[in-house]
Amino acid sequence: MEISQLLPKFKIEKIIKEWLEEDIPSFDYGGCVVGSDEKVAHLLGKQNGVFSGSIFFQEIFNQLGCKVIWFIKDGESFSMTHGPEKNKPQVLAHVIGPVRNILIGERLSLNILSRSCGITTQGYNVKKLVDGDNEQQQQQPWKGKIAGTRKTTPGFRLVEKLALLTAGLDTHRMDLSSMIMLKDNHIWACGNITNTVKNARSVGGFSLKIEVECRNQNEAIEAIEAGADIVMLDNFNPQDLQTVSTYLKQHYPHITLEASGGITSATIIQYAIPTIDIISMGNLTQGVPHIDISLKIQKQ
């Protein structure tokens, strides 16, 4: 199964068209200078990473009348040491077409890929930690899911969520319409957890799950007994998380438990315990280092 098939073609076409129009609102001065002779450009991975975002790159150059020849697939690793020559960038793809069109798509395509690959690389490395591929591995592999959050870049969410999926992670909810998440402000506005969940169920019906953010065991119990499907245990330390989640699973085995709040790659192992089903991390999409990727026209 190809993850990129999640995105309808018309949606991709619309997004890319808007981004291209944003970059060239009127004259293409640089393109006029170089002309329209056919050239070949190499897409180069200049540091270690895990690749993602090909569907966006491909659509950019489709709209610009260029051909892309791929040498890597989404989810595959690339590095500077690939092949017989050391410290040489790995060639990820060739782009063939009118030189002015290649240059139109250059910066937009690289902005997307460097961000997308950065998120996928970060997610892949975090997933390895809980999969037991390192020295910190716990005695038994954790069977839960690592998820992102809604802390995404406005207008760029599809790229970032697809990058998480490519890393083997969960997107969490895509938007406010995907699942009902009741946080502290919702609860304070409604007065208590029970009323908040009741109101949410009356508008969400049977088809939408309800998740409630809880700060302690009593709040979690109230949320469960009010009919929540998922309880987020927010900003718990590992010891308290172990105690509370164990109690909740013993008394309410049907409930899905999520740990969230301040969890990083340095601490995730402490939160990956059997009674936790989901670990969500905002830093999977916020503050992620970009991967250095370039597109170079080849001299003839």
From Swiss-Prot:
Alphabetical list of CDD domains matching this protein: QPRTase
GO molecular function, one term: nicotinate-nucleotide diphosphorylase (carboxylating) activity
GO cellular component, one term: cytoplasm
EC number per UniProt: 2.4.2.19
Catalytic activity line of the entry: nicotinate beta-D-ribonucleotide + CO2 + diphosphate = quinolinate + 5-phospho-alpha-D-ribose 1-diphosphate + 2 H(+)
Pathway: Cofactor biosynthesis; NAD(+) biosynthesis; nicotinate D-ribonucleotide from quinolinate: step 1/1
A Pfam entry, by short name: QRPTase_N
Protein's GO biological process: NAD biosynthetic process; quinolinate catabolic process
Domain of life: Eukaryota
Binding site for quinolinate: 107, 150-151, 172-173, 183, 213, 234, 260-262, 282
InterPro entries per the UniProt record, alphabetical: Aldolase_TIM, NadC, NadC/ModD, Nicotinate_pribotase-like_C, Quinolinate_PRibosylTase_N_sf, Quinolinate_PRibosylTrfase_C, Quinolinate_PRibosylTrfase_N
Region (Important for hexamer formation): 5-9
Principal EC category: transferase
Keywords: Glycosyltransferase, Pyridine nucleotide biosynthesis, Transferase
Keyword Transferase: yes
Record's keyword annotation contains Transferase: yes
Record text on subunit structure and interactions: Hexamer formed by 3 homodimers.
Functional note: Involved in the catabolism of quinolinic acid (QA).
Protein family membership: Belongs to the NadC/ModD family.
Protein name stated in the entry: Nicotinate-nucleotide pyrophosphorylase [carboxylating]
